[in-house]
Amino acid sequence: MKVLSLIFVIFSVLVLFASAKDPVCDQPKAVRRCFAAFPKFYFNSSSGQCEGFIYGGCGGNENNFNTLEECNAKCA
């Protein structure tokens, strides 16, 4: 019975760590009015998906990815 309990605890911890999301993904989309227009992607925590936006080239935060694949790998 102890072995079964230990296996359950280890499995639960592994699932918890596997589902932990990077805090970068909870940052809001940061759109500032600058003079550039770069197509980028961010993770929308409300919809649970990566979405495109136009990055103005200044300011912002780390929830800013060059490709949809990069965003999905980090956050989805």
Curated annotation (Swiss-Prot):
PANTHER family tied to this protein: KUNITZ-TYPE PROTEASE INHIBITOR-RELATED, SERINE PEPTIDASE INHIBITOR, KUNITZ TYPE, 3
Residues in the signal sequence: 1-20
Localization in the cell: Secreted
Keywords: Blood coagulation cascade inhibiting toxin, Disulfide bond, Hemostasis impairing toxin, Protease inhibitor, Secreted, Serine protease inhibitor, Signal, Toxin
Function in brief: Potent anticoagulant protein that inhibits the hydrolytic activities of all serine proteases tested (trypsin, thrombin, elastase, and chymotrypsin), with the highest efficacy on thrombin.
Disulfide bonds: C25-C75, C34-C58, C50-C71
Domain BPTI/Kunitz inhibitor: 25-75
Name of the protein in its database record: Tabkunin 5
Molecular function terms, GO-annotated: serine-type endopeptidase inhibitor activity; toxin activity
Tissue expression summary: Expressed in salivary glands.
Pfam families attached to this UniProt entry: Kunitz_BPTI (PF00014)
One Gene Ontology CC term in the entry: extracellular space
